[in-house]
Amino acid sequence: MRFKELDGLARRGETPEERAYHDRRRAELRAALYAGIAIRDAREEAGLSQTELAARIGIAQSALSRIEAGRANLTLGTLQRVTDALGLPLKLGVGSHEVAIPAA
């Protein structure tokens, strides 16, 4: 389900529980989209095609395409493999707390 579909559901008069669910789902979709954009930008800066990066991290090009489009549930393991393949640290933050995991 995409943002527009969720927004349409929110306008139909929903219970507080349904609204909370849709708000959480929108936040999850937004996070996946932002992560995908960051991966795409880093891949392009490295001069790699989707096919090349996908091969380096052991997934299909189509799976990487879904990740970059924000349409995949990205695991920390996959994210670590991406940053390792690009020679970049993985930075994770929760509120004011941030940790940088160096590339392998």
Residue ranges, per PLM feature:
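N-terminal flexible/basic segments that precede or flank functional cores
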Residues: M1-I37, V99-A104
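Short basic helix-loop element that most often maps to the first helix and adjoining turn
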Residues: F3-K4, L9, I37-A54, R81
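Short amphipathic alpha-helix starts
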Residues: A32, I57, L92-G93
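Recognition helix of helix-turn-helix/homeodomain-like DNA-binding domains
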Residues: I57-N73
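The DNA-recognition helices of helix-turn-helix-type DNA-binding domains
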Residues: R71, L86, H97-V99
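DNA major-groove recognition helix of helix-turn-helix/homeodomain DNA-binding modules
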Residues: G77-G93
